[in-house]
């Protein structure tokens, strides 16, 4: 194309004129003109007034090759005559330009250059963009712009070292093909073809230019683009467009686009001045800005040496110092980019093939083995696989392995096509492009055969998989492999993005898959045949063909009984057979006579031979997957979170500043769990040795520090004003002190230093004069937000009051700091008012910063790491100057032991008297006992506390000091049913104990708290979902000598029945016995007005609401759930609630529109459209601010959960963003209380950023916040389920304490690390003991009737009564049993299940190593072939195909129980089936009356995603206690 100065172009940086090399005198040329200015300089070289002509030093010529290897050749006389067409050479550029002139020219001349190189003044080749940094010159063949490149080379003029380059530009945006221009003062040059020696330098820049044009095409409406695409879609589209003729993999391509983001942005914003009326301004386009930001965030991803290729470093002197730093930085960046580009190319050139020839399969020869042509019809919601690019790394050769189910392959015309047409070796040339579609999901570690799945149904033959995966379309398939072992045959394909294990093809494509599988089975059979021989080469090709023809017709590899037919089949499909032989580990088989004969036959057939290169041949044009042509309306759109302005601002500003892994300092403050196993390994805690010894955690308690004085005695110090009283020790108090010229008052904030020299900020609580005359300050230490768990998510102007104090002399004060103790009005009514006040405050702070004034801090919360939270400031107790420090008052009372009398003592702040009932650690009675642990049986052998009756106290003899070790108590031991047998424990009340005559002496140190023992008739008649009281019942006497149980004699009296618990002793430790004889706390008719009006978001089937309502705390009036079956289940179980089955983003948008706050709402257009379409009834029923008192919910956990290894997909990222919508509900409604529930990985997900920002968001709203992780198994369910919780309470409310774990459970203490090496655990581990034993599998499901594999009857009869305490509670008054239905296993898995022994701990390791015959006649291995081979890498695959243990616990409940899943222990202890829906529900603590909706997959999903109601009950009960105490 002819260069047009008025065409759409982007330009490089205009260079500042450097000093001339040849002349000493400076030459000024500050106003260089762009080559695209409307007014052009004439080509006659005239200069502007006041400027002298520039004389350039003639650069050295680029180095030429000086060493040629000689080789003798015999040439004919004709061949030895060479006609040389030499191009004319000119020294001066102006003459070369004039000689290539073809007609009249307006403005700056335009030429093209070929065989060009760019170099510096010393002749060293330099990258293209180096012209922005250094003087760069051109050596090239200059040609007329419109001449043919090759035919008219004779018209070209060779010119060496001309220029220098003044600037460069990119054009061709409207045409869709990048054109690169360089300009000197004389002419503009179109860069057509670099010299071979310069190609690698120029290629990098030309690729960047090409990407710029592709991005423009995707965004500019004038060329059919869509400026509203998101970043993932933009990158995927660009990569797909340019990938059709790229030589390296897609991961590098995507990274290359991102790494060029800043370059792209700078180029495209230059086009804004040419934009049409319909085009948006590119400079402010969100997706383009996001691309630039993503590029910047990756800066520093690699740190390569920034050295020129010649190894020398040039330092330029005498230039403008103001530019030195910028130019040095640019030089380093360009050199690093060049190095990175070279690494990309080197990686892209790596081949995997070992031979240079690949014999192609002929399509016409195999056509008869395939069906008639058919065409693929794509799903409406297929997504581009590039969106799911894993971002493994810029230079990684690795790509992830995923699974593709329900798949089909087709060409660019959507015609179904065979895999055989794709070369099986990477790098092979190929003229056919094959695409694919299917449902992608995570690699779950399963080893299902492609062959097996093509013939059999999936593991759930009735309704298929619950989670089919994400529908996607693939980029071109690069290679494929066949893996085999035993009877298993697996096909895996590779694209630019991932390896895909192929599972079941679509029904339509199955006939196209069968010939490939048939050939693979044939290859396996031939290998088996050869291995049976004494040596592999014993059988020739013909003999093998003969033996294959003798196969029985029922043989899986049967082709035909005619040898010619078999031979034809083997030869035309030979490449599959060759690959399988090449991968076989036996060298004799690889080189056998059969393979030699097969290769010869294939060559005889004149099959096409494809060259295998180090890089694959580039395809011309855009070979796009035809599914990509579907309109955007048909493709699945991911809805971004709807947020309020405040939440968007907090999270947006954070991500604009910080990025994952920026600095080591950030990592130090990242909260994480000490027990950092992934979610899927939650049950592997048992595989570690559980230490049942008491774990006395070493915590750093709040303290009062007195620093050693380093007072400056020269400072003038004096008290000001009258005295303000005296301290308790008689020292005089004052309100103000003058230090030099500083006036320090009580309530001010000052800085001083501690003994280590660290500067500390202190709030002045009071000041006094010591008896020796020293002027003293008692201060409470303030911490900056970055020093708390918030880390870098904290407001940099906010400080937090702590419980640490410091006493220091007034002369130690360094400076006075402004800290405003902030208290804003609370409630939804004040949202906008407070927001405006904060905006003004922030503007003021920024103005102070610009002026260099000191920071003015704010303080509105107390940081209490020992309690894991932030609390409201005690405004009325701080800064009073009374000599009493609120921080000192909050310090925990010491745990010292006190022997009060011969009948009472104090231990760990609990007072014990004779006749009290107490707990003794189980280790005192079971020292030396051990037990075997295995997956889901880890609670076996763990014991609860022993219940004892205190009879007497005996201090140490003589003058020895009394301590917990030397002081002993005599107690009567009460036995538990589990001390007798597991059978007795199963049939007894969990609270039952047995009186005995055993009197023992126990050291006080073994005591763990107080409890009560009552007669059974005096127990409260409770139907609570969890046991929460330290109360036991007794009606039998036990004799351990003979094991006899007798009725409790009438003369035995349980003394504490006649004693009431003093009010002063209530709510202290384990002596809590505030029994509510009314039983259930669930709100009764007429009492619901005392419950909190609750909104449950991400409600699921209602596990959280169920538990909270049973506690009497809340009444769920509104619920939001996206999935219809779960929403139906919620509505059925909570008919009083208005259930909105809709995306929460739509609901929030609708609510804010309803209330007239649309201007404060940030949402997608889709959310706005769907909100506008809601019915009037729905909108009428929507809650509004002021109605909601409590918001709770668990944002989708797939992105956070380690169980979902596919958590980097955009969908998971969007789900993670749902935390923003959840927080926006809280920000808009401002309820009194807020509860967030999530998987434990939520705390450490995304390097803790999400967790920190959640806390920071709630604090910015004004809430009090506390956080912790709890184990559901310790609250009365037979399941390991660790969950993270965040409580928030409005100012003036009381944050609830964490519920005390009541059941023994083998889980470690769940700690969250804090800055400075501290940690926080919400509750202690109960592995060493707890008030009650753990709930077992038998307790949970032992009464349920037997059902078969695939049982589907929705309602059946129980058949027998409940036995265990748990069963009686969970059944309540239900007469029939619902949802006792089981997923149906396929035939092979059912056979495997039947072979798993019915004893504890058995799994796939116990399967016999043998083959079984299926009903189809196929012989298959009982042991899944892939498990033994990969066991070492996967913890021996413990639990897969595992049986539950009657005396153990369930593993973590999942949404799809299956024997080869992440939690594979899903077989009933005694029946040959997967556990039923009802059994899963019971493992979560759902009562039998609770109903689930949808099909069996829906029901399992609802249960697996739910919060166990007993855990929710325990949480709700503690909040109810906090509210009641305040009342």
From Swiss-Prot:
Residues 1092-1526 form the SAM-dependent MTase C5-type domain. One of its GO terms (molecular function) is chromatin binding. Disruption phenotype: No visible phenotype under normal growth conditions. Expressed in roots and inflorescences. Expressed in roots, panicles, anthers, pistils, endosperm and imbibed embryos. Expressed in tissues containing actively replicating and dividing cells, such as shoot and root meristems. Its EC number is 2.1.1.37. The active site is at residue 1197. Gene3D superfamilies: 2.30.30.490, DNA Methylase, subunit A, domain 2, Vaccinia Virus protein VP39. The keyword Nucleus applies. Residues 742-874, 910-1049 form the BAH domain. GO terms for cellular component: nucleus. Keywords: DNA-binding, Methyltransferase, Nucleus, Repeat, S-adenosyl-L-methionine, Transferase. Residues 1-62, 661-718 are annotated as: Disordered. It catalyses: a 2'-deoxycytidine in DNA + S-adenosyl-L-methionine = a 5-methyl-2'-deoxycytidine in DNA + S-adenosyl-L-homocysteine + H(+). Residues 709-718 have a biased composition (Basic and acidic residues). GO terms for biological process: DNA methylation-dependent constitutive heterochromatin formation; methylation; negative regulation of gene expression via chromosomal CpG island methylation. The keyword Nucleus applies. Belongs to the class I-like SAM-binding methyltransferase superfamily. C5-methyltransferase family. NCBIfam families: dcm (TIGR00675). This is DNA (cytosine-5)-methyltransferase 1A. It comes from Oryza sativa subsp. japonica. The gene is MET1A.
